[in-house]
Amino acid sequence: MLSSITLLPLLAAVSTPAFAAVRNYKFDIKNVNVAPDGFQRPIVSVNGLVPGTLITANKGDTLRINVTNQLTDPSMRRATTIHWHGLFQATTADEDGPAFVTQCPIAQNLSYTYEIPLHGQTGTMWYHAHLASQYVDGLRGPLVIYDPNDPHKSRYDVDDASTVVMLEDWYHTPAPVLEKQMFSTNNTALLSPVPDSGLINGKGRYVGGPAVPRSVINVKRGKRYRLRVINASAIGSFTFSIEGHRLTVIEADGIPHQPLPVDSFQIYAGQRYSVIVEANQTAANYWIRAPMTVAGAGTNANLDPTNVFAVLHYEGAPNAEPTTEQGSAIGTALVEENLHALINPGAPGGSAPADVSLNLAIGRSTVDGILRFTFNNIKYEAPSLPTLLKILANNASNDADFTPNEHTIVLPHNKVIGAQHHRGADHPIHLHGHVFDIVKSLGGTPNYVNPPRRDVVRVGGTGVVLRFKADNPGPWFVHCHIDCTWRLGSHLSLPRPPARFARVSSRSSPTMPGTSSAPSTRLFLPICSKW
């Protein structure tokens, strides 16, 4: 196991354990050949695994993850960064990971150690490459922070590595080739390349391919299981259900919610749900269903979007696939607006007007003959120097201090931000460094009292209205988590004034080229100078 633990004694506090651990992980980012759906191809892996190594920690711990870039395959990108999706990065904005926002890419044969105090954060997260479309080539994995005092702990008996469920869409073609298709003048409909299969915990099947054994989740009758379901796809959403079993939703994107029984739920790219499943049926095998929804599915003959299954296997049942029809989910589907945050419910500022109101709309425009996605008619282009470096080294504190296509909106510290995402096609919007309250969802009734709270929301139809507090200094990316969409320009960043960067600016290093003063972070000199 490529991990270790160091215990650090802390002063006991109401919400902090007496001992916190430093959780040490070693990530070798390397090219390996794998065949998760029966088709062998080279990928970008974490320690040679699909999905990547599971990271686990407890509330109050610190993650220390040493990333070594061993990539050599010229058919794929050979630099990398890693984003720790869902982690707030309070006081550690420089460890967030998106290339050219908080760091330069880690070049070949270099190492970088991400060090992230978790503070009081808990829940189901994941990690993935955040350089171009690299995570499509396989660099992604689960991350779980356990809470010894979880408010839902009495509701389940089992919550461990065996109950983490990773959903992925899978491509047989390397991401740089897919990017060329996206950036083609022939892509007049702005369609994402269609995947070849869907995976559950690293196993799937494509049309005409071999019958790869299904992933199996083992249960014992009478026990209650917390499944942590993660959508780590590039484009696809999945409709998750388990034959003959109800699902009780207790968490969305790391945030505990009031228990809500459903029969199925749709999960969009980047989202996570925890559900409780009671093993209360006859000891047998049952289908875990996750049919995939993807635009243009019929254009790829390899893809059967309905053929995304795993098996719920009861102790004592034969080791075999279920004999029932695979079918599709029936019953009550999750409606997002029926979710209610369990702890400190209520949108920041209540129903009063927000201190700052943002109107955001994903649109389209043609740039150099290529149709691109935009946020508010601006197509994002990554700067040559990371946004965080500009803030720290050049004291950038106004919108005008950044290039127009960097699309940066400076927010006042500790103010309530209202963001209205206008209607359009389905886009799962992700905000780094925060969660938001969804005060109005897809044409529903406004709810400022106990709305859902999460970090990825589906925007479509009639749009959504969000609330969050700008209380976490950093340059935080906002983007659609459909890979094609954000690669084609639909993202922006929301920094705070540099005076608020307390911990980041406490670490100094020499002046970087192109800046007027020391960048004040250990990240830039060793990484950017090699880029």
UniProtKB/Swiss-Prot annotation:
Cysteines engaged in disulfide bonds, as pairs: C104-C528
Instruction: Give the principal location in a single coarse category.
Output: secreted
Keywords, A to Z, come to:
Copper, Disulfide bond, Glycoprotein, Lignin degradation, Metal-binding, Oxidoreductase, Repeat, Secreted, Signal
For this protein, the record's Pfam families field holds:
Cu-oxidase, Cu-oxidase_2, Cu-oxidase_3
The secretion signal range is: 1-19
Cellular-component GO terms for this entry: extracellular region
* Top enzyme class: oxidoreductase
Q: Where does Cu cation 2 bind?
A: H85, H128, H481
Q: Where does Cu cation 1 bind?
A: H83, H430
Q: Where in the cell is it found?
A: Secreted
Binding note for cofactor: Binds 4 Cu cations per monomer.
Q: Name one GO molecular function term.
A: copper ion binding
Its Enzyme Commission number?
1.10.3.2
Report the pH profile. Answer: Optimum pH is 7.
Q: Which Gene3D superfamilies match?
A: Cupredoxins - blue copper proteins
Kindly state the tissue distribution recorded for this protein. In mycelia, at a higher level than LCC1, LCC2 and LCC3.
Q: Name one GO biological process term.
A: lignin catabolic process
Plastocyanin-like domain mapped to chain residues: 23-146, 158-315, 384-507
Q: Which cofactor does it need?
A: Cu cation
Q: How does it assemble?
A: Homodimer.
Q: What is this protein called?
A: Laccase-4
Q: Which organism was this protein described from?
A: Thanatephorus cucumeris (Black scurf of potato)
